[in-house]
Structures are given as C-alpha cells and as structure tokens.
Amino acid sequence: MGNRGMEDLIPLVNRLQDAFSAIGQNADLDLPQIAVVGGQSAGKSSVLENFVGRDFLPRGSGIVTRRPLVLQLVNATTEYAEFLHCKGKKFTDFEEVRLEIEAETDRVTGTNKGISPVPINLRVYSPHVLNLTLVDLPGMTKVPVGDQPPDIEFQIRDMLMQFVTKENCLILAVSPANSDLANSDALKVAKEVDPQGQRTIGVITKLDLMDEGTDARDVLENKLLPLRRGYIGVVNRSQKDIDGKKDITAALAAERKFFLSHPSYRHLADRMGTPYLQKVLNQQLTNHIRDTLPGLRNKLQSQLLSIEKEVEEYKNFRPDDPARKTKALLQMVQQFAVDFEKRIEGSGDQIDTYELSGGARINRIFHERFPFELVKMEFDEKELRREISYAIKNIHGIRTGLFTPDMAFETIVKKQVKKIREPCLKCVDMVISELISTVRQCTKKLQQYPRLREEMERIVTTHIREREGRTKEQVMLLIDIELAYMNTNHEDFIGFANAQQRSNQMNKKKTSGNQDEILVIRKGWLTINNIGIMKGGSKEYWFVLTAENLSWYKDDEEKEKKYMLSVDNLKLRDVEKGFMSSKHIFALFNTEQRNVYKDYRQLELACETQEEVDSWKASFLRAGVYPERVGDKEKASETEENGSDSFMHSMDPQLERQVETIRNLVDSYMAIVNKTVRDLMPKTIMHLMINNTKEFIFSELLANLYSCGDQNTLMEESAEQAQRRDEMLRMYHALKEALSIIGDINTTTVSTPMPPPVDDSWLQVQSVPAGRRSPTSSPTPQRRAPAVPPARPGSRGPAPGPPPAGSALGGAPPVPSRPGASPDPFGPPPQVPSRPNRAPPGVPSRSGQASPSRPESPRPPFDL
C-alpha cells in the first residue's frame, strides 16, 4: 500500500478492541471489523481455520458457535495464541485453544446449547496470516435444541444485529453453493442492514459438493446474483477429511488444485481460494478503516474528552502518599457537609424531579403529617359529650348543680393534652428517619472509600440518635408545661360567657336552618373508584370540600354540579389498592350505616400518589370528617349499653346546656394548645436536632474521624475503584495512542476504490435459484449445439444458426438458437439470452417459395 502507517491500522484497532472490551465499552465505540454471518453449518468456522492454518475451533452437530468470537490475526515470526480473559498465557498447542473456547463458552452459556452475546477475544500470532480482525457469530437457525429457549431464532438474530448494524462493520456473508443462494440467510441480513451493498462481501463455500452438471460460475463472476464487492469461492475440508486428520496445508493445496482443474473456475483460479480471500479481506478492511478514519477520530476524541477530567485526578495518583490521603479526607468531609446542608436547606443544583427528598420531606412532616396526626387524636363527638356529662355529674355528686363546674373543663382538657404526646413523639421519629436517609444519600459519593463511608455514617447517625433523646425530653417538657397551668385568660380563649352565647347561637341555627357563607377548605381532582362498568366505570371529577358538604363537578369551571354530599356523620377509612391498580384509595362512609352516594355504602376516592391522599385526609379533618378507629365498634356497643343514661342526658335540658358550654370551652382551649404545639414542634426539632447536626458535621465530624483510628486504613480504596482507575488509565492511554497513530497516517493513500453499484434487486425478489442449474450456463459438453461457423473475435456466446428460408426477403425474424457451451473455455461466459419479440411467420406462396419479383410483405410484429 505504500504507507507503513496504513499497515499499522489493523493492529491499532486490535489494541482498541482489547482496551474497550476490558472496560465493557466495546459496544459504545464503533470499531472497524469484519463480522462473519451465515446459516448454521454454512462453513464459517472452517473458513476461519483455513485463515489460521490450524484446527482450533469447536466442531460438532447443530449450533457450535454459541458466543461471538473476536479473532484477531497478527502477522508475526512465531506462532501462538492468547485469550483476553487469560492475560499473559500463551497457547502454542491449538488443541488447547479449542478446549479453552469450549470451556469459556460453557462458563457463560451453560453446558447445553444456550447462547450469549458476550464475546470471546482471541488473538493469533502466526507467520502464515495477514493482519485481520474478524468476528465469528453463531449460525442462524430456526429450531431450538437442548435447553435453548423457543425464541432462539430471534435471539441469534438480535445478536447478529448488534454487530452488523454498525456502519464500520464489514459483513462477510457466507453461503453454501449447494443450496438456493437467493434464499441465503446471510444475504438476507446483509441486504436488510446494508441495502447499498457497500459493506457486504460474498463467500461461496462447498463448491465441490454441487450436483454434477451444475456450477456457480455466473455467481462467482458476479453476473447472476451480483453484489457490489463481489463473491469469492472457497473449498473447505469435508467431514471425511477432518476425520482423516487431513491438515489444512494439504487442504489449501487441494483447494488450489480444484480451482485450476475445474473447467468452470480455471479462468478465475487466481481470484478464488482461501489465500486470496484473506488477502482481499486484509485489503478491504484496511481500506475500510482508512475510509472511516475521520469518523473514528471524532469518536475517539469525544471519548477522550469524556474521561479526561476523571483521568486528570488519576495521572499523579500514588496510593501510599499520606498527603494525598489527608487531602482526600478533607475534601470528602467538606463535600459531605455541603451536600447535607443543600439537601436540608434546598438548592438549585441537583434537583430531584421524581420525588420529595431531604428538607422537602421534613417540611411535609411538619405541616401535613404532624397536623394530621394531631387531629386524629381528637375524641369522637358523641364520646366527648358523654365524658363531659359524666364529669359534670360526678363533680356535683349527690347534689344537683345550679352552675357549670369549671373543674369539668380542666379535667377534659388535661385528658386531651396528654394525648398530644403520641403524635409529637411520632413526629420526632419521622424526622429522625428522614435525617438518616439524607445522610445515606449524601455518602453515596464516598463509594470509592468504603471504610470512610461506613465510619462517617456511623458517627453522624450516632450523633442523631444522641440528639433524639434530648429532643424527645424537650417535647415532653412542652406537654408538661401545657398541663401545668390552664391559661383561661388567653386572648384567643372565648371564656364562659362567650361559650354560652355560642351554645345558644348553635341551638338557634339548628332550629332556623339558615346558612351563612361557607368557607371552602380544598379543591382538586379526585377519581370516584367504585362506580360499576355498566354505569361508566371510574371517572375523574372536580371536588370542592367545605365545612358543611362535599360537592363534585364535571370540570374545574364548576358549572355542572354532579352531586353534593353532607359531611355530617361521615368518616374516613383506607382501602387497599387493587391488583392491577396504581392509584391510592380512601373511602367515605356514614357512621349510621346509611348509603353515602346513591346505592353505595361507601364512596371510594382515588389519587395518583400517597402524598395526595394524606393531604386530602388532612383537609377532611378540618371539615370534621375523622378517620375510622379500631375501637369505634366497641365504643358504639358501650354507648348502646348506656343508652338509658344517654336518654336521661337528652331529657335534662340544663345538663345539655352545660355539656354544650364545656364542649365549646374545650374546643377553644384545645385549638390554642394545638396551635402552640404545631408552632413549637418544628422549632424545637430544628434547634435541637437538625441545626445541631449540621453544626456537628461542619465542626466536629473531622475530629471524630481522626480519633477513630488509622487514617491509612480509613482511606483505603475499594477494589472496584482501583480496578476502575486502572481501566480508565489504560483506556486513556489507548485512546491517546490511537489518536497519535491516526494523526501520523497519510489519509490520501491511494487504495482500491469502492466497486460501482450493481443491480441487486434480486435480493428483494429472491426468485432466482442458486448455482447454474439452467442450461443457459452449463459448462459440460453434454448439450453442445450443432457445428456452426466460428464466431467473430470478441463476441459472447455461440453464433446464431442459419437463417430460415425467406428471411432475407423480409419474413419472420430468425428463431434464436439454444446457447451451448462456449468454444473458448477461457473466454468470457455466454450472455443470458432475452426473450425475443414473437412475430407471425410469413404467408408462403403457392409454389412454397416466395417469388423474387413479388416478395411477400411481412405482417407487422406484435408483442404478446
């Protein structure tokens, strides 16, 4: 080729393949190579063995090649083989190479007939090979055998497509000559991925096994079934030759003799056979690499830029340098502190758009989950009134009280305040859980130092647990402070006079039925989940919740109201999701066992996320719709047992007024307590836990890490990180070397140009049989035409027969003769004759011969 740099291209690509295969990125970079495709038992592996000159590939019946074999042939003075997975081991016995291929295949695919797309990289050094890189792929098959899955045909096809769809991959389409070439699996795949034929090279095997009297001359001359890069014929060893231990050197000599002695192929002998195929593939692969150099250079440069920043940290890396470890430790601690603060306080960078995280989840706990838990702890209305009535009667004792006792108010309030402890402690637990989760998220960046990550998580988590006790003590102190003194002079407390006035107003409202303007608590979309399919199925509506009722509309314009439901006597319960449902569901039901909506005992409402469900539940709590409790039925039965007392209560108007007054006072004071607790709980947790943890990370974490032991052990890298660093450095140097070699290559080197396009429509129609089975190209002398005058020099095919009588006088056109064998066996093959236009014969004269004076005018010809 006149340029030493061009000869180095194939070894360069081999080095790139090894470097990229080692780091698992071979599929990302489209390296120039040759993929060998063909049907099962088409002779692909035999062609590769002929290249090497050794028996080294597994043989047998059915599918033998079950993993892609990347075969890198390197011209060298000594002969040996190396596997990428057996680094440093040289195989001089090629029988061991065969056994290693079988063993490596079984390690991944199993001992039966399974397949895998993971390639085996084999490099063969030999003085008998040219620099070449080929990929031997599993043969295409139709029927699964052994433990192969039923879709083995599609699995193999998908594996082939991973290689042949790449623009830089040449396709070596191997087809046997003794089968219909127009139905060749290899050519079908090649046509599908390379419709222009720019990457496809045809190989015809088993030429010696064709039926007697047939040959593939027209195919090999690229006339019958043309490909842009043409065909090359080879003759492999038969099974008898293999069983007889016929070596490949003798097989190549027999192949050469076959082409020289065969009458149909002797004129093509210098362009047939395995040595010529190897030479052509070497030349075409080298030219293909040269043609793809600009694109390959761009991909290499982009790959280099993508890893350059990371490799920059590794260039001067010294594992035992104490200064490096100290610097890395300081950087890791500082990065962890910054990440933790950003996750808690919020930041514009690295925003999670899929779910809430860090501070956003804690905010949701403070302002949605905690208020919800507070409201859940309130008494049921009937139970609360019953307890107030018992308290009033027990305070009066044997006497009949004339005034409402304030001791009843204090007793009920203290009982209510004590119940706040549970949701407050639960709030602390939820915040702790989120903090620990945030710590683990922030330490993910420390994966390269597993000991440091483990120790850092342990120290910070231990500190959070220590602050947990202090925070819970302070929360309990807040509740005890509320229990210590009932401040009935609070500016927001209604007092006895206002409570009695409100009680009277409520009675008037019940009798008059007048309604003031109602405040809207929440609006939003919900899906009614339990409507039957016959009635339209689940539908989404626009819901409006107020303190008095729940309404839903067709859309958010609120023009077409579908239904309005009173919230009196309603409660909430959770509903399990259906098997195929992705929505989260809760239900409304009537405590008096009445239908809630039409014929339904409960109204099932669905949301997309659990957060929406929790938010709607909190809104329903504000409207007085509480969750169902486990003890509701027991309390209901107790109420029935004490039905006489309830009846007596309802019969005593004075007691009923006193109960209503205390109820209003309790509501007013508990609203003050809840407001205070909802305000102080986030502040307490922020001060004692979250802010304290941030300060600990910034000021004391590093000191704790230094005091925990040996820093060298703490900063030990993980094995995965060390391996990744070595692989990244190896790939970086391989990329730099590749770009350096490519830069030295003269890309203007003259090479064999791409052949011109050919008519390959036969691949689409696929109706032409393989081989020269028609008499149009029979090489044998069995069907010779009668002796005819010699043809003009340079003419193709036999001369036409003598003209029929009357043809010189303008009669019917001559009937074409059936072509026979070419008189010159080394001359060009005969052309395939076209169908002549049929013309009617001339009308003969009475004498049986046309008169010279009255020539017979021919009738105009017509086409059938």
From Swiss-Prot:
<keyword id="KW-0597">Phosphoprotein</keyword>
<dbReference type="GO" id="GO:0051289">
    <property type="term" value="P:protein homotetramerization"/>
</dbReference>
<dbReference type="GO" id="GO:0042803">
    <property type="term" value="F:protein homodimerization activity"/>
</dbReference>
<feature type="modified residue" description="Phosphotyrosine">
    <location>
        <position position="354"/>
    </location>
</feature>
<feature type="region of interest" description="G4 motif">
    <location>
        <begin position="205"/>
        <end position="208"/>
    </location>
</feature>
<feature type="binding site">
    <location>
        <position position="45"/>
    </location>
    <ligand>
        <name>GDP</name>
    </ligand>
</feature>
<keyword id="KW-0944">Nitration</keyword>
<feature type="compositionally biased region" description="Pro residues">
    <location>
        <begin position="825"/>
        <end position="843"/>
    </location>
</feature>
<comment type="similarity">
    <text>Belongs to the TRAFAC class dynamin-like GTPase superfamily. Dynamin/Fzo/YdjA family.</text>
</comment>
<feature type="modified residue" description="Phosphoserine; by GSK3-beta">
    <location>
        <position position="774"/>
    </location>
</feature>
<dbReference type="InterPro" id="IPR030381">
    <property type="entry name" value="G_DYNAMIN_dom"/>
</dbReference>
<feature type="binding site">
    <location>
        <position position="59"/>
    </location>
    <ligand>
        <name>GDP</name>
    </ligand>
</feature>
<dbReference type="GO" id="GO:0042583">
    <property type="term" value="C:chromaffin granule"/>
</dbReference>
<keyword id="KW-0505">Motor protein</keyword>
<feature type="binding site">
    <location>
        <position position="239"/>
    </location>
    <ligand>
        <name>GDP</name>
    </ligand>
</feature>
<feature type="domain" description="Dynamin-type G">
    <location>
        <begin position="28"/>
        <end position="294"/>
    </location>
</feature>
<feature type="modified residue" description="Phosphoserine">
    <location>
        <position position="306"/>
    </location>
</feature>
<feature type="modified residue" description="Phosphoserine">
    <location>
        <position position="778"/>
    </location>
</feature>
<dbReference type="GO" id="GO:0030139">
    <property type="term" value="C:endocytic vesicle"/>
</dbReference>
<dbReference type="InterPro" id="IPR000375">
    <property type="entry name" value="Dynamin_stalk"/>
</dbReference>
<dbReference type="GO" id="GO:0006898">
    <property type="term" value="P:receptor-mediated endocytosis"/>
</dbReference>
<dbReference type="InterPro" id="IPR001401">
    <property type="entry name" value="Dynamin_GTPase"/>
</dbReference>
<dbReference type="InterPro" id="IPR019762">
    <property type="entry name" value="Dynamin_GTPase_CS"/>
</dbReference>
<dbReference type="GO" id="GO:0042802">
    <property type="term" value="F:identical protein binding"/>
</dbReference>
<dbReference type="GO" id="GO:0003723">
    <property type="term" value="F:RNA binding"/>
</dbReference>
<feature type="modified residue" description="Phosphoserine">
    <location>
        <position position="851"/>
    </location>
</feature>
<dbReference type="InterPro" id="IPR011993">
    <property type="entry name" value="PH-like_dom_sf"/>
</dbReference>
<feature type="binding site">
    <location>
        <position position="46"/>
    </location>
    <ligand>
        <name>GDP</name>
    </ligand>
</feature>
<keyword id="KW-0378">Hydrolase</keyword>
<dbReference type="Pfam" id="PF02212">
    <property type="entry name" value="GED"/>
</dbReference>
<dbReference type="InterPro" id="IPR045063">
    <property type="entry name" value="Dynamin_N"/>
</dbReference>
<feature type="modified residue" description="Phosphoserine">
    <location>
        <position position="822"/>
    </location>
</feature>
<protein>
    <recommendedName>
        <fullName>Dynamin-1</fullName>
        <ecNumber>3.6.5.5</ecNumber>
    </recommendedName>
</protein>
<keyword id="KW-0342">GTP-binding</keyword>
<feature type="binding site">
    <location>
        <position position="43"/>
    </location>
    <ligand>
        <name>GDP</name>
    </ligand>
</feature>
<keyword id="KW-1003">Cell membrane</keyword>
<feature type="modified residue" description="Phosphoserine">
    <location>
        <position position="347"/>
    </location>
</feature>
<dbReference type="InterPro" id="IPR022812">
    <property type="entry name" value="Dynamin"/>
</dbReference>
<feature type="binding site">
    <location>
        <position position="44"/>
    </location>
    <ligand>
        <name>GDP</name>
    </ligand>
</feature>
<feature type="domain" description="PH">
    <location>
        <begin position="519"/>
        <end position="625"/>
    </location>
</feature>
<keyword id="KW-0254">Endocytosis</keyword>
<feature type="modified residue" description="Phosphotyrosine">
    <location>
        <position position="80"/>
    </location>
</feature>
